[in-house]
Amino acid sequence: HLRLISNKIADNVSEKDCIFLIGEIGVGKTTFTRNFINYLQKQEGVEETEVLSPTFNLLYEYDIKNLKVMHYDLYRIKNNKELDQLGIFKEDLSAIKIIEWPELVETNLVNRLELHLKYSNKDSERELSITGHGKWKDINKNEL
């Protein structure tokens, strides 16, 4: 199910869009990102690459033909100075940004899609809620 949603979002995303992935460790944030990036690579006829969690690197970049995807993990960010050094929120950045742990920092990005993942009571199932802002404000999870 997460793969289908990541594919639908990938079909509708454009440069400068931002996807916030919110949820506990192991709930599926990096899995969503892997599905999203591999789907874009497949659509563009680019060889699929391994998509890892950027917990220790803070950032992995993926160039997919004329599209750039920047995958951030803010789990280890301690202050705004460290965040500024990453340059995530610079307006001139024309990449799609996927950000894990965005709730650890304050941001007011206009065009962002928030995916809230949490564990379900059922084994290995997850619950997903989606909130859109800016161009995504009218997003309906049932349409995905």
Language-model regions, residue ranges each:
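Phosphate-binding P-loop
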Residues: 9-16
